[in-house]
Curated annotation (Swiss-Prot):
The keyword Transmembrane helix applies. It is an enzyme of class 2 (transferase). Catalyzes the transfer of sulfate to position 4 of the N-acetylgalactosamine (GalNAc) residue of chondroitin. Chondroitin sulfate constitutes the predominant proteoglycan present in cartilage and is distributed on the surfaces of many cells and extracellular matrices. Can also sulfate Gal residues in desulfated dermatan sulfate. Preferentially sulfates in GlcA->GalNAc unit than in IdoA->GalNAc unit. Does not form 4, 6-di-O-sulfated GalNAc when chondroitin sulfate C is used as an acceptor. The gene is CHST11. Widely expressed. Highly expressed in spleen, thymus, bone marrow, peripheral blood leukocytes, lymph node, heart, brain, lung and placenta. It is found in: Golgi apparatus membrane. It is linked to A chromosomal aberration involving CHST11 is found in B-cell chronic lymphocytic leukemias. Translocation t(12;14)(q23;q32) with IgH. Osteochondrodysplasia, brachydactyly, and overlapping malformed digits: An autosomal recessive disorder characterized by bilateral symmetric skeletal defects that primarily affect the limbs. Affected individuals have mild short stature due to shortening of the lower leg bones, as well as hand and foot malformations, predominantly brachydactyly and overlapping digits. Other skeletal defects include scoliosis, dislocated patellae and fibulae, and pectus excavatum. This is Carbohydrate sulfotransferase 11. It catalyses: chondroitin beta-D-glucuronate + n 3'-phosphoadenylyl sulfate = chondroitin 4'-sulfate + n adenosine 3',5'-bisphosphate + n H(+).
Length: 352
């Protein structure tokens, strides 16, 4: 083959390679600009396409600066609840602000969802299992889809949710200022009876019987048997109440979270909560939170009938055998919760 022909063939091959390289580069440039103009879509846990959160309205904006000019009845209701907390804190400032500065340990009940800019203070015996399930769905990045598929014991594993005390002080302050903060409350004595029934009348709660039952029986029961002192599994409600109002109890250690006051768990006189949900309107209030977070179209609060739920009628029965003196002392322990969340004094109480 002649040298001139070989040279022509070699040049053609080089030209084709250069053309292919240029074409590939051009395609990459086009793809880059398209990605800049159209952000990559991600899928929420239920398979609904939603764009990245950046640029959308935050829950705080949805709550305090709604698109519609006229506030809804729900928004007005929650404003009244916020005002009730503020007024109670102001009226009881000497009691409610004994501690001016919170420590990180005070924030361990505040669960953080960075994706949706939410902070939830969980209160045991106020639907906290289902709300922890919801927070796991919201923060799970696709790991979970149906809240009710998450086992109850898994919802209470601390490693599954991030709490505010795990952040630095500047990060804590930023989130308290920028995120929507909410909690759920319940009539204080109904919550207390619910805690007693769950922790002291169920045979499987051996750890509570050993940890608290034995101590309560030793302190409150005269002529207790050795078996009762050893097992602690037959604590009477009257003994439980006597333990709670005993001044020595909280001097020894703080109340367990299941019967600790909401005021002490969530510090509403130090932290401004944007929403106060109530157990009595649980489904409605929960779905309002989800709506403000921008997930209400595909995520709802789980509903199911629980036949073992503690009711007002049950609570009335439990308090029948409590003396008026002990009822009065117990009310003083939970008084701030009654006032702050606008619960009236129960009609069954015989206060001195």
């Amino acid at each position: 083959m002649k040298p001139a022909l070989l040279e022509v063939m070699r040049m053609n091959r080089i030209c084709r390679m250069v053309l292919a390289t240029c074409l590939g580069s051009f395609i990459l440039v086009i793809f880059y600009f398209q990605s800049m103009l159209h952000p990559v879509m991600r899928r929420n846990p239920f398979g609904v396409d939603i764009c990245c959160r950046k640029g959308s309205r935050s829950p705080l904006q949805e709550l305090y600066n709604p698109i519609q000019l006229e506030l809804s009845n729900t928004a007005v209701l929650h404003q009244m609840r916020r005002d009730q907390v503020t007024d109670t804190c102001r009226a009881n400032s000497a009691t409610s602000r004994k501690r001016r500065v919170l420590t990180p340990n005070d924030l361990k009940h505040l669960v953080v969802d960075e994706d949706h800019e939410l902070i939830y203070c969980y209160v045991p015996k106020v639907a906290c299992t289902n709300w922890k399930r919801l927070m796991m769905v919201l923060t799970g990045r696709g790991k979970y889809s149906d809240p009710m598929e998450i086992p109850a014991n898994e919802a209470h594993v601390s490693a599954n949710l991030k709490t505010l005390n795990q952040y630095s002080i500047p990060e804590i302050n930023h989130r308290l200022k920028s995120y929507m903060k909410f909690l759920f409350v319940r009539e204080p004595f109904e919550r207390l009876v619910s805690a007693y029934r769950n922790k002291f009348t169920q045979k499987y709660n051996i750890s509570f019987h050993k940890r608290y039952g034995t101590k309560i029986i030793k302190r409150q029961r005269k002529n207790a048997t050795q078996e009762a002192l050893r097992k602690g599994d037959d604590v009477k409600f009257e003994e439980f109440v006597a333990y709670l109002i005993d001044p020595h109890t909280q001097r020894e250690e703080p109340f367990n979270e299941h019967w600790q006051t909401v005021y002490s768990l969530c510090h509403p006189c130090h932290i401004h909560y944007d929403l106060v949900g109530k157990y009595e309107t649980l489904e409605e209030d929960s779905n309002y939170v989800l709506q403000l977070a921008g997930v209400g179209s595909y995520l709802k609060f789980p509903t199911y009938a629980k036949s073992t739920r503690t009711t007002d009628e049950m609570t009335t029965e439990f308090f029948q055998n409590i003396s008026s003196e002990h009822q009065t002392q117990l009310y003083e322990v939970y008084k701030l919760d009654f006032l702050m969340f606008n619960y009236s004094v129960p009609s069954y109480l015989k206060l001195e």
